[in-house]
Structure formats: structure tokens, C-alpha cells
Amino acid sequence: MPKKSSVAIVGSGNISTDLLYKLLRSEWLEPRWMIGIDPESEGLARARKLGLETSAEGVDWLLAQSEKPDLVFEATSAYVHRDAAPRYEEAGIRAIDLTPAAVGPGVVPPANLRDHLDAPNVNMVTCGGQATIPIVHAVSRVVDVPYAEIVASVSSASAGPGTRANIDEFTKTTSAGVQNIGGAQRGKAIIVLNPAEPPMIMRDTIFCAIPEGADHDAITQSIKDVVAEVQTYVPGYRLLNEPQFDEPSVVNGGNHLVTTFVEVEGAGDYLPPYAGNLDIMTAAATKVGEEIAKKSAEASLASGAQA
């Protein structure tokens, strides 16, 4: 078995703690450190109990250590990561960014998982992006998509202070991802924090404008194939019904449309199952980290064989 890549988690909130449990199961990644700024954080306490080295002194502490991680997963906030990103790169640490900072290229596994495995910093877009961009990609690889709009509805109970502070970045980063990763010519993103009790699981609606005469069967099959791919790392990701095709009308702006409805139920590793919006972020980040670690291990084996 190849040597695992060592990992530091920067941030000690809900997303970081859920991520920790996923990383502990990984065959390719070894979480060694968790870094925060609150000494009383439940995340740091859990990490210590699980054998990680922890600190509440932030990134300064991590970068001052003689041994540094191969990978950093950062789940803080956009402005914090923008400050830290150049410091990670200078230290030779690859960064997987779970904030909307978008310092590095965005990665959504079904769309472009292998395109940026050598980048020093990759961005996981947003929870809404991870849930909806695969569908836009599924449609755009069959037909041109002049416009795509996504509506992500998540439980208010799953939106902590970090999520709420990042709402503006969420809409900008997700809209850009719908275009740059999903393949739509124009994109728009809307997030809804639903206060319903008991909390509802994440539900997303994806509208894609398509050409007249588009092959509905091919689009439907492409969507189902992508859903199956996402389910390999997020088992609770599913279609709510068959993709719906609509003729042009005043309501839809005169476009031929395909509308897809998905829901995301979390695995319940640390966060409750209704927090599928957070679970899909940590699961996708783990998937990307494992692919980076695999490529690094393959490169090491190849160089060793040549020597």
C-alpha cells in the first residue's frame, strides 16, 4: 500500500469536523492536524480524542512546525483563505479550499476531476455548486446550454455563521461555476435558507435552456449517468423525478427548457442527515484529495522505478 498523504484541516467548525470523519476512512489520506482559533471548539476537542495534533493558534502555528502536511483542507471563510493561500503555496503545501474564495480553479468531480490535479490550490466551489453543476455539465455535454439557473434550498439549521457570512460569495462563485465548469454560456445561482421545522434536506432545482429539437432521451440518460457518478461518493444524492422538458412560454422566457430536481441527504458522519448541503462539500473534497494523493503516489512509484 502506498504511503498516505498527510493532511491538515484548517478550521474547526461543522464542515471541518464532518470532513475529519470522512478523511479518517480514506485509504489515501491521513489527517494529522486540525487548526482553529477557538480553544474551546468542539471540533478541536473531537480531533484531539481521535489522535490528531491540534492548535487554536491558526495557520501561523501550522506553518511554524518543522513537519508540514502534504495537503491542507481549509474550511474557514473566503477572506481567511485568500490571505492564507499564498503562504501554503510558498511552503509547498497543496490546498483544497472549501470556502468560496476561488483562489484556484474550481473542481466538481463529475465535470473536471482530473483537470487540475497538479494545481497548487483547488476550490470546491460551493455546496450548491457541487449539487447542481454536475447536472448542468450533463446537459451541456449533449447540447449547447445558452442559459442555466440553479436554485439551492437548504435547511436554515444547517447554515452556520460561516455559510451566512459567505452568502454573497456563494452566489458569485456558484454562478461562475455554472458557466466555467458546467458549460452554460450564462449562469445564475440563488440560495434559499428554509426555516422549516423539522429541518428539510437539501433540494435543488436546475433549469437549463436547450435548443429546439434537442434529443430528450440523450439528455435524460446523460443526467442519470452523472447522478450515478455523484452517488459513488455521495450515496444520498438522487433525482426526485424524471427530467422535465418544457416548450417555450412567457413564463420561461421563450426558451426550450429541461428542469431537473435533485435532493441531497447527508451520510450523518457528524452532521445530521438533513445537512446534505454540507455533506456533499466534504465528500467531494475528500474525493478530490484522494485523487491528488493517488497521482502523487503514482509519481513517486514511477520515479522510484526509474532510479
Swiss-Prot record:
Swiss-Prot/TrEMBL catalytic activity: acetaldehyde + NAD(+) + CoA = acetyl-CoA + NADH + H(+)
Positions contributing to NAD(+) binding: 12-15, 158-166, 277
EC id: 1.2.1.10
Pfam families cross-referenced by the UniProt entry: AcetDehyd-dimer
EC class (word): oxidoreductase
Disulfide bonds: none
Record GO biological process: catabolic process
Keywords of this entry: Aromatic hydrocarbons catabolism, NAD, Oxidoreductase
InterPro entries: Acetaldehyde_dehydrogenase (IPR003361), Acetylaldehyde_DH_C (IPR015426), NAD(P)-bd_dom_sf (IPR036291), Semialdehyde_DH_NAD-bd (IPR000534)
Gene Ontology terms for molecular function: acetaldehyde dehydrogenase (acetylating) activity; NAD binding
Top-level taxon of origin: Bacteria
Active site: 127
Similarity field: Belongs to the acetaldehyde dehydrogenase family.
Protein's UniProt name: Acetaldehyde dehydrogenase 2
Gene: mhpF
